[in-house]
Amino acid sequence: MNKNNNIEIFSIGGYSSWCYYKPFRALFDCGEGFATHFRNKIFGVDSLYLSHVHSDHLSGIPQFLNSRTSARGDKEKELTIYYPISVYGQEKIDAIKTLTKFNKHVKWVGILPDFKQDITNKHYITAFKTRHSKESLGYIIYEKRTRLKREYKNRNQHEIKRLVASGEKISEQYEFADFVYALDNCGFSEEINGCNWFIQDANFLNPDDKERNTHNTLSEAINKANEIDAKNTILTHVSSRYFNEPPKVKVPNGMVLLDKPIKFKF
C-alpha cells in the first residue's frame, strides 16, 4: 500500500469519525476530537464534507469551528461545510450553528446525491447515495486524465509522431476516481471502475455480530473494494467491541484494517 502521509484518519463506530485528505485540504466528517488531534493544522482545512448527521460524524464541529476563532492562525479564513439535506438533519445543523455563531467565516451548503463541484482545474468532487441512513452520502474526488485512444495503443512511436504531426486526434479524456469516501455504509450502487484510495466501512469483524443492515461486515467491505477495483483500501469504522480482544483476521494485499482506537496516517 502507498504511504505518503496524505490521509489522516480516526474512526471508531458509534464514537467518532473524521478523515482529512491533504492534497485538497478536504475534511470528511468531523467527529469528536478532530480539533484536539489537529491543533493549529485546523486552519489548513478549506472544506468539510459531511456524510450524514449521526453524532459520531459531526460532534466535533463545535470545537473545530470555535477553535478557529481562538487558536493561532488565520481567524478570518473561509470554510465551507457541505451536508446532506434532510428535515431531521437540519435540526442538528441548526443547533451547531447556534453553538458556533461567533465564527462568521463559515458557509453552510445543503446538498443532494447529484452534487458536483470543481475543486481544481483537473479535479472535481461528487456525492452519491449510500445505504446507511435516510440521507447518508459518500463522496468521490475524480481526476481528469488523458490517454491514448484504444485504436492507437499498438502503434509504434514513429507512427504516433506521424499521426500527431498530421493533426490526428489520438488521445481522449477520461475520469479516474482518485479518492472514494464511504463512511458509513452497508453498500452502495454508485458505479466506480477503479480508484486510488477507498475509505470503507468494516464495522463488524465477526459477521455473527451484525444485527441491522446499516454497516458492513469485514467480508462485505472487502468484496466491495474488489468490486470497484480499489488500489488502496482503508477498512475502518470498526466497532469498539473488538478492541480489547480483536479477532485474528487477514485482509488482502492493498488493504489495511484499522482495528485500534488511534489516529492513522497514510
PLM feature spans:
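General small-molecule cofactor/ligand-binding pocket signal
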Residues: 82, 106-112, 126-128, 180, ...
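Cap/insert and terminal regions of metallo-dependent hydrolase folds
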Residues: 81, 89, 166-266
